[in-house]
Amino acid sequence: MKVLALRHSVAQVYADTQVYTHDNSKDEYENAFLISNLTTHNILYLNYSVKTLQILNKSGIAAIEIQKMDELFTLIRCNFTYDYIDDVVYLHDYSYYTNNEIRTDQHWVTKTNIEDYLLPGWKLTYVGYNGSDTRGHYNFSFRCQNAATDDDAIIEYIYSDELDFQSFILKKIKERMTTSLPIARLSNRVFRDKLFKTLSVNHDKVVNVGPRNESMFTFLDYPSIKQFSNGPYLVKDTIKLKQERWLGKRLSQFDIGQYKNMLNVLTTLYQYYDMYHEKPIVYMIGSAPSYWIYDVKQYSDLKFETWDPLDTPYSNLHHKELFYINDVQKLKDNSILYIDIRTDRGNMDWKEWRKVVERQTADNLYIAYKYLSTGRAKICCVKMTAMDLELPISAKLLHHPTTEIRSEFYLMMDIWDSKNIKRFIPKGVLYSYINNIITENVFIQQPFKLKTLKNEYVIALYALSNDLNNREDVIKLINNQKKALITVRINNTFKDEPKVGFKNIYDWTFLPTDFETSESIITSYDGCLGIFGLSISLASKPTGNNHLFILSGTDKYFKLDQFANHMSISRRSHQIRFSESATSYSGYIFRDLSNNNFNLIGTNVENSVSGHVYNALIYYRYNYSFDLKRWIYLHSTGKASIEGGRYYEHAPIELIYACRSAREFAKLQDDLTVLRYSNEIENYINKVYSITYADDPNYFIGVKFKNIPYKYNVKVPHLTFGVLNISEQMLPDAIAILKKFKNELFGMDITTSYTYMLSDEVYVANISGVLSTYFKIYNAFYKEQITFGQSRMFIPHVTLSFSNEKTVRIDTTKLYIDSIYLRKIKGDTVFDMTG
């Protein structure tokens, strides 16, 4: 959903668009809630309130002021992520395909021969970091740039088994045009940039679990962030390999040698960050022209010093010459060294060429050892070839993708590795490594142990659901880690599957009720965005690959109506009941009937079940940005910080009724997951609320009427407005509550319209118009620890006779209250009041 705020209406009609005019009779929060539950994708918001826009954005729903028609046209035709703090719109707009172009935000790609393999007549365009170079295309009142690129497809091609790039990119473009936009992946980069910038300012120690290559630029400016990954491939791990021969295999039609060099350097850099927590000088020997340095400098101020007879245009200091062994002494401490020396083969015979390569490999290794032999804080990554070698057992082997798999791999060592025990590695074993293993990640740090960290802020995005992790240990970590943002895969199966397959792995599934967190927000991706100053135009869809975002230690926890709130809670219900269901009242009718309340007159205005909780349960797959457990808990403790004006507080029994209705719904739908979720939420309600029932009552509240439009043979027909189980010492407190609600009680608009048999020989008249006040009084009694109400649903009625009678239907008739009293059952009246 996107909300585009206009001062004046527009004549043009847009598909999937609805107009909402600000309702001045309601406060900003109520307007925001109504907007959020509209069912179209585009909302044109007229006579808007800036405060309402702020509320929507904090809820993760993109809401933007529109000043010009160009802005409206651009935003209505595509999806986007909105930085509502800095007023920046990041479009995810692929309409540039109509210019016969694909786009990249990695400069090195533009220096390859990739355009030789594009679709006929197509070109490649560089658009800068997150599309920053496209800002000039949009002369808007807010900053706007198009962050959409095809880098995901290019990188996927590099790691795939496909060789024909034109066929591959054609397939990917067609997929993009025919399937739902993977909005979370597109906006994730914007989110990660914002997230780590915020956390690094607010927390001294930040730990990040499970980063992948898509984050390789994100962390360049954060050397102090501790990374945990899957660990490196060590020289000693080759003991498991059998010997093989040269294979020779082309991975890419266009030259990706620069990409390989960049990955090698970044892998070395992040290893340095892991060990020393600061930025090094980056020395590079060979590997010209290294256009990828330009990409790195878009994200960081790293300094590069390079040696190569060819130009390296983006180096801070380039020596256009060969590097000799005596030059090693020029290299300073606190540095990394990348050695990528290889003479061109030219017309050399392959046997002669092989001798040259082996000699250069030995020379490269000698430079590496020389560099590491003195000083401190150094790591080296050196080009190697498959040959009989003695290598340190703790050194790391790297084999990032390159244009062709031949004899080349890379060795990474720190000072300690260079002095460690060496092992003889046969050429055939190294060929086996080269032929079978691709390094898929620049982050090769040690795996994370599922234990709480006392002083660190832990971030684990899409990293812990894998069934290689012990599920109970994941839950324990989330429950106990005081400061964290952790995601786990939500269980949106219908058979309550404990794990689901994804690609070639299995993930554990989770529901919010699996966790017993303290002061944590459990929300969706878009709910999490709102907390970090972002909003999004397309909410998460229930694809099966959805995640709960669990934020612990956030100062937003008590701000119940500002973040991870109830916005959009009825949207799915509206979509269904206004298009597919038997009636738009279907939800109200079902909730009453499933709790044995058969008086459906006025059910849409006087419903005895919490619609919030009911919708949050049965449609949790569609809107889990609303943190239901937090909402229940903060109301139960009275600690909710409510900024909005009108805010209805439910009685705990209304929440219980909602769980029962949701359970009935789940049984009819054969939805085992909602069935469990409903049961567990009901158990949670009973845990945080101390609900007691007056199933053996000794007092009741009676309402006597001036007029009863039916025949009756009881002495005094009355409405039993709830029963109590209290001691005589509690009578003054109960009476005080009745006095407090006197005006509201006598102001109830009470009506009746028919009679019926409540049970055998109990003939009653229906009563409407009292439930809202009943639940308010229930809450007042609950807060004073006075037992009020029974475990079964309160069905308002007036007993007319203790005999079997025929049903009578009359025109709806208003009843006027004569008196309201508190009486002991089979005893005397202890309190009486009149209007």
Swiss-Prot record:
Region 2'-O-methyltransferase activity, annotated ranges: 246-428
Catalytic center residues: H718, T720, H797, T799
Localization in the cell: Virion
Keywords: GTP-binding, Host-virus interaction, Hydrolase, Inhibition of host innate immune response by virus, Methyltransferase, mRNA capping, mRNA processing, Multifunctional enzyme, Nucleotide-binding, Nucleotidyltransferase, RNA-binding, S-adenosyl-L-methionine, Transferase, Viral immunoevasion, Virion
Reaction equations catalysed: a 5'-end diphospho-ribonucleoside in mRNA + GTP + H(+) = a 5'-end (5'-triphosphoguanosine)-ribonucleoside in mRNA + diphosphate; a 5'-end (5'-triphosphoguanosine)-ribonucleoside in mRNA + S-adenosyl-L-methionine = a 5'-end (N(7)-methyl 5'-triphosphoguanosine)-ribonucleoside in mRNA + S-adenosyl-L-homocysteine; 5'-triphosphoadenylyl-(2'->5')-adenylyl-(2'->5')-adenosine + 2 H2O = 2 AMP + ATP + 2 H(+)
Statement: the UniProt record of this protein carries the keyword Chloroplast: no
Chain coiled-coil ranges: none
Region described as GTase/RTPase activity: spans on this chain: 556-692
Record GO terms (molecular function): GTP binding; hydrolase activity; mRNA 5'-cap (guanine-N7-)-methyltransferase activity; mRNA guanylyltransferase activity; RNA binding
Role: Multifunctional enzyme involved in mRNA capping. Catalyzes the formation of the 5' cap structure on the viral plus-strand transcripts. Specifically binds to GTP and displays guanylyltransferase and methyltransferase activities. Has affinity for ssRNA but not for dsRNA. Capping activity is non-specific and caps RNAs that initiate with either a G or an A residue. Together with VP1 polymerase, forms a VP1-VP3 complex positioned near the channels situated at each of the five-fold vertices of the core.
Name of protein: Protein VP3
Protein species of origin: Rotavirus A (strain RVA/Human/Philippines/L26/1987/G12P1B[4]) (RV-A)
